[in-house]
Structure formats: C-alpha cells, structure tokens
Amino acid sequence: MNLSLFGAGKIVLSILFVFSLTACFPTSQHPIEGNPMVNLDDTFSGIWKGELSDGPVTILFIQQSQDDTGTFHIGGLLVRHHEERPSLNEGWLEFEGEVVVIRDETFLSAQLNQMGGAPVAAEEKGYYLFRLVLEENSMRVLGLNNLVTAELVNRGALEGTVNRAQTTASIRLTSNGAALREFLNTANLAELFSSSFAQLARRQ
C-alpha cells in the first residue's frame, strides 16, 4: 500500500469525524465556568477504551493540570478504530479541555487541536460541551441534544446561532462561561445532555 495515500486516508477520516461531530453536537464559543474538581487523583489519566456511536475508540489522557484559578485542564488523543477490525486505526484527534463541577455534576468543555497531524482550521475551532458520568473505572460521555439546544437558542434561553442550511442544524453557542454555568444550575440535565457520545472503560 502507498504509505502517503494511507496517511491521506487517515486525515480524510479524521476530517469526516470532525464534520460528524459538528453535525451531531453544538459547539460553544466559550468553555463552561464552574467549581474545580476535588480529589482528582488519576481520573483523567491512562488509557480508556470503549465505543462511539459508530465504532470502537481509544482515548489516551496525556496531560492534566490545574491553573491558579482552580480550573482543571486535561489533554489527550482520541484514536478511532475500524468497526470490524479494531486493530486498524482510522485516524486520530488531539484535544484539550477544561473540567468543572456544577450541582455535583462533572462537565467537560473540549476543543480539537489537531486531526491526523494537521492543525484544526480556525473556522472549525470551538468547545464541545459534555456531561461526564464517572465511576471508578468507567466513564459515560453525554453531549448536548441538538434539537433541545436549538429550541433553547430560538427562545432566548441561551445565546447563539442556529444554521439550518445543512440537513442537520449547526448550532453555535455564544453565551459566556458564567452564563452557561448559571443556565446549567437550573437546567434539566437529563434532557439537555441526552446524546450519547462515548462509553469508556479504563484499561486495567
């Protein structure tokens, strides 16, 4: 196999993954503000394996730190595997994020830095907002529901734009981090974060 074509194929698959993320989940101009996590231990470290909605995935957490404001930062790689042949990698994404706690719930604001070794274009930058359901060795990652978020933007509960030029509406939230925190303090989280992104288990 031509290695250059193989590498290009991985980049194309990574790009398609970014497009599918944008189509399935709203993005935010700002990360969520909230309280810092406590007892971090090694929650966001090591190797986690699991399933996306369309195939197997491995997430490698390679960086975690806390800044002077108490905000917890993480970074890592997401590697997609072939659905029928998990030993084959279909591409990878480098991401970073901020983790906060609101109402004893854990939230991740994640943005992509690289896909398949190429920097993410400026127009594709943005935070994907997730609710994390954490157990000792498992993690469920829930994304914003597109329809619910669009309705919230349309009635002014959240600031943002809804672009219906595509088959699936593309949503961009513009509320700042404090406004997002205030909204999440009273929101129906089960309804808002009802789109499953990944189910992961820590590799022992």
Model-found features: residue ranges?
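Bacterial N-terminal signal peptides that target proteins for export
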Residues: 2-12
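Generic hydrophobic-segment detector
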Residues: 13-14, 94
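C-terminal motif of bacterial Sec signal peptides marking the signal peptidase cleavage site
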Residues: 20-23
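Calycin-type beta-barrel ligand-binding domains and close structural analogs
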Residues: 25-43, 51-57, 64-204
